[in-house]
Amino acid sequence: AGVEITELSTHLQGQLVAVNPAYDEAFDAFAPAHLHGKPAARKDWAIDQMMKAAIASERLGLSHTVSFTGSLAFPFLYPWPQRPAGLVEEAFAELGRRWTPILNHYQDHGQDIGFEIHPGEDVFDGATFEMFVDACGGHEAAMINYDPSHFLLQQLDYLQFIDLYHERINAFHVKDAEFNPSGRQGVY
């Protein structure tokens, strides 16, 4: 018996693969101090860490990891003020350019990555996951880390999500969540 490792988590490293400049200072906290204030070097470090995690996962006899996609477009989630035409599409194209080589490396090492559908990430619901997979050429190593606690706050149907995406779910994280809106406060 004992404790069994089911997957490696690379949430912080994955986040740093794609950071909107508006978040640079905040996300520096996730990287080593010598990378603070150096977004390009921080991104390169994060990609290197992701590549190393694929090898570590393989050596541990695992086949799944979990991560975040990053947040190039998330500051523009709400459609007001109006986004410039093509902004979201270009952000997802850039995600595809950054993540496809990482996904290829994972696949070469018998791994896949379950991306957590999470507020604050560019992949925050089923529609954005589909956009991400399309941007990565339908990559088979792009999977979902299913954590329905976030779905409650986003008012997503967490059961129908399973019906729609069960073939892409590679991990399941469990924790409690509740939504208690009032006349003074909503989701956040």
Language-model segment annotations:
Residues 2, 40, 152-155:
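Residues at alpha-helix boundaries and short interhelical turns
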Residues 6-7, 14-19:
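Short active-site-adjacent helix-start/loop capping segments
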Residues 1, 9, 20:
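N-terminal substrate-binding region of glycoside hydrolase catalytic domains
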Residues 5-10, 65-67, 113-115, 142-147, ...:
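Hydrophobic faces of well-ordered beta-strands that scaffold small-molecule active sites
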Residues 17-143:
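Active-site acidic/histidine proton-transfer and metal-coordination neighborhood
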Residues 10-14, 69-73, 117-121, 148-150, ...:
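Active-site-proximal loop/turn and secondary-structure-junction residues that shape catalytic pockets
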Residues 1-6, 49-64, 157-170:
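Short amphipathic alpha-helices and their capping/turn segments at secondary-structure boundaries
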Residues 92, 122, 126-130, 150-188:
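Gly/Pro-rich active-site loop or hairpin
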